Amino acid sequence: MGVERIKAAFENGKKAFIPYVMGGDGGLEILKERMRFLDEAGASIVEIGIPFSDPVADGPTIQRAGKRALDSGVTVKGIFQALIEVRKEVQIPFVLMTYLNPVLAFGKERFIERCLEAGVDGIIVPDLPYEEQDIIAPLLREANIALIPLVTVTSPIERIKKITSESEGFVYAVTVAGVTGVRQNFKDEIHSYLEKVKSHTHLPVVAGFGISTKEHVEEMVTICDGVVVGSKVIELLENEKREEICEFIQATKQKEEA
């Protein structure tokens, strides 16, 4: 399915709620169980983090989750196997968030083959500059897997146009300077930034980094096409507060109907 499965998540004005889970945090059986829960709860897409020892874009919550996964001996191979098994039950799109090093260490051709086996629809590589994306972009295109672009508040218009013109899936618009993590509020210029990104791409635009309350979700989906919630989802899963995740999803759906 690949790119088409991601497109379907945004069809007919749908607003996407995209939770992030760290692959292997709590073990691979827990990963599968969380994927099933998020699918049943109504998540639009699930973003799965590949744990890495030098996660430069991750805030403290996601760093700790990655460290727990690595300390427990979780491997990229194991995460793929868990995804292969759970894909038989879960139909929503899978997007991997991985740094470049684990892809190259695994072998990029082999990594993409395993993505196909696991039904992965897209990949985000936060430390892969646009200028170097040919390292994996042609292989991903051939496999019909979207390489999801990231743009930031400081990205000039021309760069946003260039980055998004050849991309597929959706645009990940980073809403804060710095790393992921929980924030209290967003500056007014974030609204104009998101509107600017939307006006210069044919793809859906999803806001991420720092989104941690239902109010944030409601605010962001009035401007763009969806949200990624990472650190807060990890916290809620860890503390068994799943009903709050369902409330986030409901907040997204309500804006869809508004």
Swiss-Prot record:
<dbReference type="InterPro" id="IPR011060">
    <property type="entry name" value="RibuloseP-bd_barrel"/>
</dbReference>
<keyword id="KW-0028">Amino-acid biosynthesis</keyword>
<dbReference type="InterPro" id="IPR002028">
    <property type="entry name" value="Trp_synthase_suA"/>
</dbReference>
<keyword id="KW-0456">Lyase</keyword>
<protein>
    <recommendedName>
        <fullName>Tryptophan synthase alpha chain</fullName>
        <ecNumber>4.2.1.20</ecNumber>
    </recommendedName>
</protein>
<dbReference type="InterPro" id="IPR018204">
    <property type="entry name" value="Trp_synthase_alpha_AS"/>
</dbReference>
<dbReference type="GO" id="GO:0005829">
    <property type="term" value="C:cytosol"/>
</dbReference>
<dbReference type="InterPro" id="IPR013785">
    <property type="entry name" value="Aldolase_TIM"/>
</dbReference>
<comment type="subunit">
    <text>Tetramer of two alpha and two beta chains.</text>
</comment>
<comment type="pathway">
    <text>Amino-acid biosynthesis; L-tryptophan biosynthesis; L-tryptophan from chorismate: step 5/5.</text>
</comment>
<comment type="similarity">
    <text>Belongs to the TrpA family.</text>
</comment>
<feature type="active site" description="Proton acceptor">
    <location>
        <position position="58"/>
    </location>
</feature>
<keyword id="KW-0057">Aromatic amino acid biosynthesis</keyword>
<keyword id="KW-0822">Tryptophan biosynthesis</keyword>
<dbReference type="GO" id="GO:0004834">
    <property type="term" value="F:tryptophan synthase activity"/>
</dbReference>
<feature type="active site" description="Proton acceptor">
    <location>
        <position position="47"/>
    </location>
</feature>
<dbReference type="Pfam" id="PF00290">
    <property type="entry name" value="Trp_syntA"/>
</dbReference>
<comment type="function">
    <text>The alpha subunit is responsible for the aldol cleavage of indoleglycerol phosphate to indole and glyceraldehyde 3-phosphate.</text>
</comment>
